[in-house]
């Protein structure tokens, strides 16, 4: 039987049923490289088991929180705190994997250590959660950063990738238009936040119903985190102020002119 050499990107969660399926899918393959886009629990934990089975090295930007603008304790629940790559890669590095070249494209925002992998031979970008096929990424502070996310989206517009293969959703065959729509969506959301501040709505829990009309109340927490990411960016840029540390319970006020 002929075994192919393959690289596995984001092997997934450390779940027994998932690991069994992963092992079955790879039974006729020779895994030479394990590439990790970012350290969330649905992406990186299975890398440890896959490495044990195959002996392949793991590649990633670094441990969870690597690349964050500000230090401090990691508080988000979805981080894989145990991941540490065998090979730490940086923006522009090229991985020769099973005869093909993967260019590492650092795209912080969804997480500070997020990396996309560009398959040069096919002008294809494995975009992880930076660009997903069905919605914009959730940006959860402190490891998620809205300013970094927007800069990383604009960075992709300078590239010539023809197709994106996201971790969630189908292939994206009009990547530049797709990314431009994500940028426009986030700028619209930012404008809504500034409008709320202008109207005297100063607390995130009071902003959510107006900015997300009709949203299931069970999702208010996630929506609030997204607004917090926008507000942290506005505070850093001097377009808003917070009474004390900017967090979900802070009082925010608008200063200066709105960015439109």
Regions inferred by a protein language model and the residue ranges of each:
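Short, small-residue-biased leader/transition segments that mark boundaries at the very start
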Residues: 1-2, 259
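Active-site HxH/HxHxD metal-binding segment of metal-dependent hydrolases
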Residues: 6, 11-101, 123, 133
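Metallo-beta-lactamase
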Residues: 6-8, 13-15, 74-86, 101-192
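Residue-level signal for inorganic ion chemistry
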Residues: 22, 168, 193, 234
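Histidine-centered divalent metal-coordination motifs
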Residues: 37-43, 50, 110, 168, ...
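Aromatic/hydrophobic pocket-lining residues that form the small-molecule binding cavity
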Residues: 44, 149, 153, 227
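C-terminal regulatory/interaction regions
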Residues: 195-257
């Amino acid at each position: 039987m002929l075994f192919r050499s393959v690289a596995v990107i984001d092997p997934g969660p450390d779940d027994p049923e998932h690991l069994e399926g992963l092992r079955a899918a790879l039974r006729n393959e020779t895994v030479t490289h394990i590439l990790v886009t970012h350290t969330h629990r649905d992406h990186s934990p299975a890398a440890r088991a896959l490495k044990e089975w195959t002996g392949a090295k793991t590649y990633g930007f670094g441990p969870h929180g690597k690349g964050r603008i500000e230090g401090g304790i990691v508080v988000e629940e979805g981080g894989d705190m145990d991941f540490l790559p065998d090979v730490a890669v940086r923006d522009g590095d090229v991985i020769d994997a099973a005869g093909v070249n993967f260019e590492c494209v650092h795209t912080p925002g969804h997480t500070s250590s997020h990396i996309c992998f560009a398959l040069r031979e096919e002008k294809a970008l494995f975009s992880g959660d930076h660009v997903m096929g069905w919605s914009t990424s959730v940006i959860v502070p402190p490891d998620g950063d809205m300013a970094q996310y927007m800069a990383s989206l604009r960075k992709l517009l300078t590239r010539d990738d023809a197709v994106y293969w996201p971790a969630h959703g189908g292939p994206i065959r009009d990547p530049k238009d797709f990314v431009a729509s994500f940028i426009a969506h986030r700028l619209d959301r930012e404008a809504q936040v500034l409008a709320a501040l202008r109207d005297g709505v100063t607390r995130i829990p009071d902003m959510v119903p107006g900015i997300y009309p009709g949203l299931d109340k069970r999702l208010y927490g996630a929506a609030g985190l997204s607004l917090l990411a926008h507000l942290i960016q506005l505070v850093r840029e001097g377009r808003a102020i917070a009474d004390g540390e900017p967090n979900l319970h802070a009082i925010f006020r608008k200063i200066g002119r709105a960015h439109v």
